[in-house]
Amino acid sequence: SYDEKKLEKFLNNITNKKIWLDSLSCSFFYKNLLEKKNKIFNKVDPIYFLKSIKNKTEIKNMKKIHIIDGAALTKFLIWLKTNFKKTKITEISAQKKLENFRKMNPSYKYPSFSTISGTGPNGAIIHYKVSSSTNRILKKGDIYLVDSGGQYSYGTTDVTRTISLNNKSNFIKEVYTRVLKGHIAVSNFLIKKNSTGSEVDRDARKFLKKIKLDYPHGTGHGVGYFLNVHEGPQSLSKNNKVNLKNGMILSNEPGYYKKGRFGIRIENLVYINKNKFHELTVAPIEKTLIKKNILNKKEINWINNYHKRVKRDLGKFMSIKEKVALSEACSPI
């Protein structure tokens, strides 16, 4: 690394060269400095592509850590469902409780990003960060959105679940189910030779768009290995033209946000192998918000098969009471 002044001096001394520069990762100041005396070729940093393709060991370890992380998240979800009616739980206390569950594993290092812990209208703020002045109590009738992740010594996680606190709204169930349909469409997307993230993003939105709704963010981003939770160059977004390749890891996180009322997002991490997406995240998906009548047979089978795997992989980490709750959360719809 360089002291900024020394770096500026060093770059000033480069003249009459052809320089490969990635403007997405280089500041305007340094780009402008180099352009004055050199010829710039603006291309994506090739290291991005190399880093985005995970090797077999990285994939193996990511599978392992997602089971560990999924157990922590599931214990938290069971605790939350069991206790929100009988004790005061706030966005801050819920966030701390979730991290405490993660800390129980010695390989956990720290959060992979600032946890988004939002109930009711705060859940509609896409990058919400709770503070003492915005901290809300989780109340009956709310839906609670928690987007969190961990950095472990052998992997990075990022997962979102939207939880019903006895919410009965038909509109919320309709929208939630359409978000889930989009999530499943991504999971089932058949990746061809030249498939890009923009094609997948379009598939994820189509069920919301049928009722003239949408979400104002990309459907997914690349994820690093004990590195940045947001990693390029691949993403599932409208303008991303990077070809999807075996070994890439991405998030799958469609959502919907009603300002002042609620937020919905369902996020798993997936990896690409043999031209298909495969689930890394292992945690129950909220069933009480699902409107089964707008799901087709393939989607119902996806949910039931996913939950069968969740129950199988996480059961050994649960207490007797937690196993009962896990079985209920993962029972067929």
Give the location of each predicted region.
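Active-site neighborhoods and metal-handling regions in enzymes and metal-associated proteins
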Residues: 1-333
